[in-house]
Protein backbone atom coordinates (compact mmCIF):
# COMPACT_ATOMS: atom_id res chain seq x y z
CA UNK A 1 0.00 0.00 0.00
CA UNK A 2 2.95 2.30 0.57
CA UNK A 3 3.27 2.55 -3.23
CA UNK A 4 -0.01 4.46 -3.46
CA UNK A 5 -0.78 8.00 -2.46
CA UNK A 6 -4.47 8.75 -1.95
CA UNK A 7 -5.47 11.88 -3.86
CA UNK A 8 -9.15 12.16 -2.93
CA UNK A 9 -12.21 10.14 -2.06
CA UNK A 10 -14.28 9.67 -5.21
CA UNK A 11 -17.18 7.62 -3.95
CA UNK A 12 -18.64 4.97 -1.76
CA UNK A 13 -19.21 1.61 -3.37
CA UNK A 14 -21.20 -1.35 -2.12
CA UNK A 15 -18.21 -2.77 -0.28
CA UNK A 16 -16.22 0.26 0.83
CA UNK A 17 -14.67 3.63 0.06
CA UNK A 18 -13.24 4.35 -3.38
CA UNK A 19 -10.25 6.69 -3.68
CA UNK A 20 -8.49 8.31 -6.56
CA UNK A 21 -4.86 7.39 -5.93
CA UNK A 22 -1.48 7.71 -7.56
CA UNK A 23 1.08 4.97 -7.96
CA UNK A 24 4.25 6.60 -6.61
CA UNK A 25 6.50 4.38 -8.73
CA UNK A 26 4.81 4.76 -12.12
CA UNK A 27 2.82 7.98 -11.69
CA UNK A 28 -0.29 6.12 -12.89
CA UNK A 29 -3.56 7.46 -11.49
CA UNK A 30 -5.95 4.68 -10.43
CA UNK A 31 -9.14 3.95 -8.52
CA UNK A 32 -8.41 2.28 -5.21
CA UNK A 33 -11.24 0.32 -3.60
CA UNK A 34 -10.94 -0.59 0.03
CA UNK A 35 -13.06 -3.67 0.63
CA UNK A 36 -14.71 -3.74 4.04
CA UNK A 37 -15.73 -7.23 5.01
CA UNK A 38 -17.79 -8.30 8.02
CA UNK A 39 -15.14 -10.92 8.60
CA UNK A 40 -12.38 -8.39 9.29
CA UNK A 41 -11.70 -10.17 12.56
CA UNK A 42 -10.80 -13.46 10.84
CA UNK A 43 -9.19 -11.76 7.87
CA UNK A 44 -10.13 -12.02 4.22
CA UNK A 45 -11.67 -15.36 3.20
CA UNK A 46 -9.35 -17.34 0.92
CA UNK A 47 -12.30 -18.06 -1.39
CA UNK A 48 -12.71 -14.31 -1.95
CA UNK A 49 -9.01 -13.94 -2.72
CA UNK A 50 -9.22 -16.81 -5.23
CA UNK A 51 -12.30 -15.35 -6.92
CA UNK A 52 -10.77 -11.90 -7.15
CA UNK A 53 -7.49 -13.21 -8.54
CA UNK A 54 -9.41 -14.81 -11.42
CA UNK A 55 -10.84 -11.39 -12.31
CA UNK A 56 -7.38 -10.11 -13.20
CA UNK A 57 -7.64 -12.36 -16.26
CA UNK A 58 -10.80 -10.59 -17.53
CA UNK A 59 -9.32 -8.33 -20.19
CA UNK A 60 -11.82 -6.57 -22.43
CA UNK A 61 -12.20 -2.95 -23.63
CA UNK A 62 -15.63 -2.72 -21.96
CA UNK A 63 -14.60 -4.12 -18.58
CA UNK A 64 -12.94 -1.86 -16.01
CA UNK A 65 -9.48 -3.40 -15.65
CA UNK A 66 -8.51 -4.84 -12.27
CA UNK A 67 -4.84 -3.90 -12.13
CA UNK A 68 -3.87 -5.33 -8.79
CA UNK A 69 -5.06 -6.95 -5.58
CA UNK A 70 -3.37 -5.84 -2.37
CA UNK A 71 -3.96 -7.97 0.69
CA UNK A 72 -2.47 -6.53 3.87
CA UNK A 73 -3.26 -7.28 7.51
CA UNK A 74 -6.92 -8.26 7.21
CA UNK A 75 -7.66 -5.62 4.62
CA UNK A 76 -8.20 -5.94 0.92
CA UNK A 77 -7.56 -3.22 -1.62
CA UNK A 78 -8.48 -3.55 -5.28
CA UNK A 79 -6.66 -1.34 -7.77
CA UNK A 80 -8.71 -0.47 -10.88
CA UNK A 81 -8.19 1.71 -13.93
CA UNK A 82 -9.74 5.15 -13.37
CA UNK A 83 -12.54 6.54 -15.53
CA UNK A 84 -14.11 10.01 -15.68
CA UNK A 85 -17.67 9.47 -14.53
CA UNK A 86 -20.40 6.92 -13.90
CA UNK A 87 -23.55 6.59 -16.00
CA UNK A 88 -25.78 7.65 -13.08
CA UNK A 89 -24.06 11.04 -12.81
CA UNK A 90 -24.06 11.40 -16.60
CA UNK A 91 -27.81 10.64 -16.80
CA UNK A 92 -28.48 13.15 -14.01
CA UNK A 93 -26.47 15.80 -15.88
CA UNK A 94 -28.36 14.98 -19.11
CA UNK A 95 -31.79 15.00 -17.44
CA UNK A 96 -33.03 18.08 -19.31
CA UNK A 97 -31.84 17.32 -22.84
CA UNK A 98 -31.64 13.54 -22.53
CA UNK A 99 -28.91 11.29 -23.92
CA UNK A 100 -28.95 11.31 -27.75
CA UNK A 101 -30.18 8.00 -29.21
CA UNK A 102 -26.92 7.27 -31.11
CA UNK A 103 -25.04 7.48 -27.79
CA UNK A 104 -27.60 5.28 -26.00
CA UNK A 105 -27.24 2.75 -28.81
CA UNK A 106 -23.44 2.88 -28.62
CA UNK A 107 -23.44 2.47 -24.83
CA UNK A 108 -25.87 -0.45 -24.93
CA UNK A 109 -23.86 -2.14 -27.70
CA UNK A 110 -20.60 -1.76 -25.76
CA UNK A 111 -22.15 -3.01 -22.51
CA UNK A 112 -23.54 -6.06 -24.30
CA UNK A 113 -20.05 -6.73 -25.68
CA UNK A 114 -18.63 -6.60 -22.16
CA UNK A 115 -21.41 -8.87 -20.87
CA UNK A 116 -21.00 -11.37 -23.73
CA UNK A 117 -17.28 -11.58 -22.93
CA UNK A 118 -17.79 -12.14 -19.19
CA UNK A 119 -20.66 -14.56 -19.69
CA UNK A 120 -18.53 -16.60 -22.11
CA UNK A 121 -16.06 -16.93 -19.21
CA UNK A 122 -18.94 -17.93 -16.91
CA UNK A 123 -18.60 -14.77 -14.83
CA UNK A 124 -21.83 -13.05 -13.73
CA UNK A 125 -22.15 -9.52 -12.42
CA UNK A 126 -25.40 -9.83 -10.42
CA UNK A 127 -25.48 -6.18 -9.35
CA UNK A 128 -25.49 -4.07 -12.53
CA UNK A 129 -26.73 -0.50 -12.07
CA UNK A 130 -25.89 2.90 -13.60
CA UNK A 131 -23.50 3.60 -10.70
CA UNK A 132 -21.14 0.82 -11.76
CA UNK A 133 -21.09 1.63 -15.46
CA UNK A 134 -18.21 4.03 -16.06
CA UNK A 135 -17.67 6.35 -19.00
CA UNK A 136 -14.81 8.39 -20.45
CA UNK A 137 -14.52 11.38 -22.78
CA UNK A 138 -13.76 9.15 -25.79
CA UNK A 139 -17.22 7.59 -25.85
CA UNK A 140 -16.33 4.30 -24.16
CA UNK A 141 -18.42 2.74 -21.40
CA UNK A 142 -17.18 -0.04 -19.12
CA UNK A 143 -18.64 -2.43 -16.59
CA UNK A 144 -17.16 -2.08 -13.10
CA UNK A 145 -17.25 -4.45 -10.11
CA UNK A 146 -17.61 -7.56 -12.24
CA UNK A 147 -17.43 -10.77 -10.21
CA UNK A 148 -17.36 -9.01 -6.84
CA UNK A 149 -20.83 -10.33 -5.98
CA UNK A 150 -19.58 -13.89 -6.21
CA UNK A 151 -16.48 -13.15 -4.16
CA UNK A 152 -18.20 -11.18 -1.40
CA UNK A 153 -21.95 -11.75 -1.82
CA UNK A 154 -24.52 -9.01 -2.53
CA UNK A 155 -25.27 -7.38 0.82
CA UNK A 156 -28.69 -5.98 1.75
CA UNK A 157 -27.02 -2.79 2.91
CA UNK A 158 -23.71 -1.18 2.04
CA UNK A 159 -21.00 -0.67 4.63
CA UNK A 160 -22.50 2.80 5.29
CA UNK A 161 -25.93 1.15 5.85
CA UNK A 162 -27.37 2.47 2.61
CA UNK A 163 -29.88 0.09 1.09
CA UNK A 164 -28.50 -1.69 -1.98
CA UNK A 165 -30.86 -0.86 -4.84
CA UNK A 166 -33.41 -3.41 -6.04
CA UNK A 167 -34.40 -1.42 -9.14
CA UNK A 168 -32.34 -3.52 -11.55
CA UNK A 169 -32.86 -6.91 -9.90
CA UNK A 170 -34.26 -9.74 -12.03
CA UNK A 171 -37.63 -11.25 -11.07
CA UNK A 172 -36.18 -14.74 -10.55
CA UNK A 173 -33.92 -13.36 -7.80
CA UNK A 174 -36.84 -11.43 -6.24
CA UNK A 175 -38.92 -14.64 -6.29
CA UNK A 176 -36.26 -16.47 -4.30
CA UNK A 177 -34.61 -18.53 -7.03
CA UNK A 178 -31.27 -19.80 -5.69
CA UNK A 179 -29.81 -20.93 -8.99
CA UNK A 180 -29.71 -18.11 -11.45
CA UNK A 181 -27.89 -17.53 -14.67
CA UNK A 182 -26.29 -14.91 -16.90
CA UNK A 183 -29.88 -13.84 -17.73
CA UNK A 184 -29.96 -11.76 -14.49
CA UNK A 185 -27.44 -9.34 -16.01
CA UNK A 186 -29.46 -9.01 -19.23
CA UNK A 187 -32.52 -8.03 -17.17
CA UNK A 188 -30.53 -5.35 -15.32
CA UNK A 189 -29.16 -3.98 -18.58
CA UNK A 190 -32.69 -3.90 -20.05
CA UNK A 191 -33.82 -1.74 -17.12
CA UNK A 192 -30.82 0.57 -17.67
CA UNK A 193 -31.56 0.77 -21.43
CA UNK A 194 -35.14 1.90 -20.69
CA UNK A 195 -33.86 4.43 -18.13
CA UNK A 196 -31.43 5.99 -20.63
CA UNK A 197 -34.31 6.36 -23.10
CA UNK A 198 -37.05 7.71 -20.80
CA UNK A 199 -34.80 9.54 -18.28
CA UNK A 200 -36.42 7.81 -15.33
CA UNK A 201 -36.00 4.45 -13.62
CA UNK A 202 -38.22 1.75 -15.10
CA UNK A 203 -39.00 -0.08 -11.84
CA UNK A 204 -38.01 2.12 -8.86
CA UNK A 205 -39.17 -0.19 -6.06
CA UNK A 206 -38.53 0.53 -2.38
CA UNK A 207 -38.97 -3.04 -1.08
CA UNK A 208 -38.83 -6.51 -2.61
CA UNK A 209 -42.61 -6.79 -2.90
CA UNK A 210 -42.96 -3.23 -4.26
CA UNK A 211 -40.23 -4.09 -6.77
CA UNK A 212 -42.06 -7.23 -7.93
CA UNK A 213 -45.42 -5.48 -8.16
CA UNK A 214 -43.95 -2.61 -10.22
CA UNK A 215 -42.61 -5.21 -12.66
CA UNK A 216 -45.96 -7.05 -12.72
CA UNK A 217 -47.93 -3.83 -13.31
CA UNK A 218 -45.86 -3.12 -16.41
CA UNK A 219 -45.17 -6.58 -17.84
CA UNK A 220 -48.27 -8.33 -16.49
CA UNK A 221 -48.33 -10.78 -13.56
CA UNK A 222 -46.45 -13.87 -14.79
CA UNK A 223 -48.17 -17.27 -14.96
CA UNK A 224 -47.17 -20.76 -16.09
CA UNK A 225 -47.89 -19.85 -19.72
CA UNK A 226 -45.34 -17.02 -19.99
CA UNK A 227 -42.94 -18.44 -17.39
CA UNK A 228 -43.10 -22.21 -16.84
CA UNK A 229 -42.21 -23.02 -13.21
CA UNK A 230 -42.94 -19.55 -11.82
CA UNK A 231 -45.73 -20.74 -9.51
CA UNK A 232 -43.38 -23.14 -7.73
CA UNK A 233 -40.70 -20.53 -6.98
CA UNK A 234 -39.96 -20.05 -3.24
CA UNK A 235 -41.47 -16.57 -2.92
CA UNK A 236 -44.31 -16.85 -5.43
CA UNK A 237 -47.77 -16.35 -3.91
CA UNK A 238 -51.01 -17.42 -5.64
CA UNK A 239 -52.55 -14.30 -4.02
CA UNK A 240 -50.43 -11.92 -6.18
CA UNK A 241 -52.80 -9.46 -7.95
CA UNK A 242 -53.28 -10.30 -11.64
CA UNK A 243 -52.21 -7.30 -13.69
CA UNK A 244 -52.37 -7.15 -17.50
CA UNK A 245 -49.29 -6.41 -19.60
CA UNK A 246 -48.89 -2.83 -20.84
CA UNK A 247 -48.04 -2.04 -24.42
CA UNK A 248 -44.32 -1.22 -24.81
CA UNK A 249 -45.15 1.84 -26.89
CA UNK A 250 -46.52 3.32 -23.63
CA UNK A 251 -43.61 2.09 -21.49
CA UNK A 252 -40.79 3.51 -23.64
CA UNK A 253 -42.54 5.93 -26.04
CA UNK A 254 -39.37 7.43 -27.58
CA UNK A 255 -38.11 4.01 -28.79
CA UNK A 256 -38.68 2.76 -32.32
CA UNK A 257 -39.97 -0.72 -33.11
CA UNK A 258 -36.49 -2.32 -33.19
CA UNK A 259 -35.64 -0.78 -29.82
CA UNK A 260 -38.89 -1.98 -28.27
CA UNK A 261 -38.38 -5.45 -29.72
CA UNK A 262 -34.88 -5.69 -28.20
CA UNK A 263 -36.05 -4.34 -24.83
CA UNK A 264 -38.94 -6.80 -24.63
CA UNK A 265 -36.51 -9.67 -25.28
CA UNK A 266 -34.15 -8.38 -22.56
CA UNK A 267 -37.09 -8.21 -20.13
CA UNK A 268 -38.52 -11.64 -20.91
CA UNK A 269 -39.84 -13.22 -17.69
CA UNK A 270 -38.50 -16.71 -18.42
CA UNK A 271 -34.71 -16.52 -17.94
CA UNK A 272 -34.31 -19.39 -20.42
CA UNK A 273 -36.04 -17.37 -23.13
CA UNK A 274 -34.45 -14.02 -22.26
CA UNK A 275 -32.10 -12.93 -25.05
CA UNK A 276 -28.38 -13.59 -24.49
CA UNK A 277 -25.80 -10.81 -24.77
CA UNK A 278 -24.35 -12.49 -27.86
CA UNK A 279 -27.74 -12.72 -29.59
CA UNK A 280 -28.62 -9.14 -28.59
CA UNK A 281 -25.51 -7.85 -30.39
CA UNK A 282 -26.94 -9.22 -33.66
CA UNK A 283 -30.31 -7.50 -33.18
CA UNK A 284 -31.44 -5.15 -36.03
CA UNK A 285 -31.52 -2.26 -33.51
CA UNK A 286 -27.71 -2.14 -33.84
CA UNK A 287 -27.63 -2.09 -37.66
CA UNK A 288 -26.54 1.56 -37.67
CA UNK A 289 -24.53 1.64 -34.42
CA UNK A 290 -21.74 4.26 -34.26
CA UNK A 291 -19.47 5.51 -31.46
CA UNK A 292 -20.35 9.13 -30.66
CA UNK A 293 -18.53 11.16 -28.01
CA UNK A 294 -20.49 12.33 -24.95
CA UNK A 295 -20.63 15.95 -23.80
CA UNK A 296 -19.10 15.56 -20.37
CA UNK A 297 -19.35 18.32 -17.81
CA UNK A 298 -16.47 17.33 -15.58
From Swiss-Prot:
The keyword Acetylation applies. One of its GO terms (cellular component) is endosome. Its cofactor is Mg(2+). The keyword Nucleotide-binding applies. It catalyses: L-seryl-[protein] + ATP = O-phospho-L-seryl-[protein] + ADP + H(+); L-threonyl-[protein] + ATP = O-phospho-L-threonyl-[protein] + ADP + H(+). Pfam families: Pkinase. ATP binds at residues 10-18, 33, 81-83, 86, 129-132, 145. Phosphorylated at Thr-160 by CDK7 in a CAK complex. Phosphorylation at Thr-160 promotes kinase activity, whereas phosphorylation at Tyr-15 by WEE1 reduces slightly kinase activity. Phosphorylated on Thr-14 and Tyr-15 during S and G2 phases before being dephosphorylated by CDC25A. Nitrosylated after treatment with nitric oxide (DETA-NO). The record marks 9, 88-89, 166 as: CDK7 binding. It is found in: Cytoplasm, Cytoskeleton, Microtubule organizing center, Centrosome; Nucleus, Cajal body; Cytoplasm; Endosome. The active site is at 127 (proton acceptor). This is Cyclin-dependent kinase 2. It comes from Mesocricetus auratus.
Amino acid sequence: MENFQKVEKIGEGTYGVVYKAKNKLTGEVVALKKIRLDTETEGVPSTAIREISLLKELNHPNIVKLLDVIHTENKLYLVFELLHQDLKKFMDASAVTGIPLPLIKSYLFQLLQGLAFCHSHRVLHRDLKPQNLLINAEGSIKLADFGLARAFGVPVRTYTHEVVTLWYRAPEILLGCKYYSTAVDIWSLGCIFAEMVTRRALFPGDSEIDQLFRIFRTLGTPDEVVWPGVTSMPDYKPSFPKWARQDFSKVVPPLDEDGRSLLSQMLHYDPNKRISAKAALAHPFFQDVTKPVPHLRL
